Amino acid sequence: MITTLTTLFATLFDREQLLQQARSLHAIERLKKIHPADSVLALVRSAVGDERPSIATARRQFQALTGYRPEESSFYERLTPGLANLCWKTFLGALSKATHVQRREVARALGLKVRDIRAVDASVVSLPERAAKHLPSTDSRLGGFKITAALSLLEDLLVSAHITDARQHDRKAFGLPKDVEGVLWIHDRGYADHRLFAHIADGKGYFLIRLKSSSQPIVRSIRSGLAQCHLGKHLSRELPVHGVVDLDAEFTVGRNQTRVFRVVGIPVARNKQGRADWIWLATNLPESTPATTVGTFYRLRWMIETLFRALKGIGRFDEVPSGNPAVICAFIGSTLIGLVLSQAICVAMRVERPGSEPSLMRVFALVLSNLSDLAAAFHSHRLEAALEPFVAALWREGVNPNPGRPYARDRHLATVAA
């Protein structure tokens, strides 16, 4: 595990590589005493530290890392669009170096050859009113941005993150990548676009997307949960369904085309209004995948809510106090660097000890508290020795403190793999 972490931290701590990237991105004009690697580390610690993230906090973190306290104006001048791009590029570099772990037994539960299962969702973060000019919000008194993230459920890693202003609709903020083949995409109602269904299916991918109440396709065949006399009717929520519903329905795609996709209805004891209800899921998973398994896979979508809680709780995504778009983007990239490092460490822990339950929240906090010491050890070629107490702390403090109550992710994955 120490070898894995050495490679992982080298991505962030390689000063020469970061300096070359900074020059290519015009993040610096002259080196002087403020090295871009130290600036990025200071921003990461400021973004996910104990204090409110701000330029003043980042300046103090810079002093803690280097022993040098730059003038406020000098430090602020370094927070340029180039430095914001450097933070984002470093985040993408950490993303590409993350260790991958395939859960083949989960793929077998689907009865399909899938490369990955990805949950997509978005979360809105409020910003001060002075940011509204560049990042407008739905509230005219505030600015805001929306982060649209794709999370690999098999690898428990962030796959992509896209930033837009807060007014952007969920569907428009999500761009379907080219590598859809063999990937199961899980989305909430904000992405219930029939054209998206068709694009994923045409790309030889799979989808599992919750339907809006306004989506009422025509019932074409019924396997369970609805009487055959309702063939040819619109799938209205008033139809007399019972138990788990499994059927095929015809969707309108665009103006003139139609496509037939599978629809699964999963009963829930109580909805938000306290009444019995059904969750309706559109999918192109074949009939050989049981309807109950389809419902269990959709429950895994809540893993991405845990990711957003980590970003807003430990990363304090919603506490960026600036109206400067370069500063905002720098703090966003810095927070995501800390998150990806923490996720990759969790994956390495699962590889080292199969069956262990690392906690993203706890590991995130440990990364924060040890980041400066690990960076200093890397620069003095003592990283491997410094990693030994860090790894010991991970196993002591970074795992589920109550193994008798497994986390939802492990519980649901165990269910579908059984």
What is each model feature region?
Residues 66:
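Blade-loop segments of beta-propeller domains
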Residues 1-55, 61, 69-70, 75-77, ...:
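Single, function-defining residue in the core of a domain
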